[in-house]
């Protein structure tokens, strides 16, 4: 029986994996994609203390290596079900069922896409989902903000300090 299964190998999951395995726990981490989560689609990270501007995938790989450096294991695949039996949990995948004392869910977020042609290819190359993260790359340029509710307004207000807002649109009307 494992001590901990972590579902999600983005920055939060990898950090938890590092700390838990370093503390001597028997840890298994799952993800259905490459470790690193959103870092893998971030062209450049400029706002991480202690690092010079670095490509997101490079940081993701370094985090992955660190997370596994104390003996944790990684499995690729989708978790289909979690069953709680009180003293232990079962984590069910297509390949196998695992028993563990604890489960940590660190699956992150997924932005709602606009269904534009080639949208996936343009993420990190013109399409961004984080004004604070990527706004400085577009300083003094005209940008569009498309979103819903308060978050779109907050992003637009922040970007207005750096960029010219050519268009701000609520997703429901796009």
What are the language-model segments listed below?
Residues 1-7, 23, 74-141:
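FAD-binding core/adjacent interface of flavoenzyme oxidoreductases
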Residues 1-2, 6-32, 123, 129-171:
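Rossmann-like dinucleotide/flavin-binding elements
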Residues 19, 62, 66, 102, ...:
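Alpha-helical scaffold segments in soluble metabolic enzymes
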Residues 39-40, 115:
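A short local structural element in Rossmann-fold oxidoreductases
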Residues 40-97:
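N-terminal Rossmann-like dinucleotide/flavin-binding domain of flavoprotein oxidoreductases
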């Amino acid at each position: 029986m494992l001590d901990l299964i972590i579902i999600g190998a983005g920055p939060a999951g990898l950090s938890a994996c590092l700390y838990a395995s370093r503390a001597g726990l028997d840890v298994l981490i799952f993800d259905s994609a490459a470790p690193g989560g959103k870092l893998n689609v971030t062209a450049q990270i400029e706002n991480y203390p202690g690092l010079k501007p670095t490509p997101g995938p490079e940081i993701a790989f370094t985090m992955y290596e660190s997370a596994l450096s104390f003996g944790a294991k990684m499995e690729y695949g989708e978790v289909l079900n979690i069953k709680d039996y009180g003293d232990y949990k079962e984590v069910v995948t297509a390949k196998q069922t695992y028993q563990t004392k604890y489960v940590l869910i660190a699956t992150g977020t997924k932005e709602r896409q606009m269904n534009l042609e080639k949208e996936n290819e343009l993420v990190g190359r013109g399409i961004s989902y984080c004004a604070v993260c990527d706004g400085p790359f577009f300083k003094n340029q005209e940008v569009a903000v498309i979103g819903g509710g308060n978050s779109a307004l907050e992003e637009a207000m922040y970007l207005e300090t750096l960029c010219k807002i050519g268009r701000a649109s609520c997703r429901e009307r796009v």
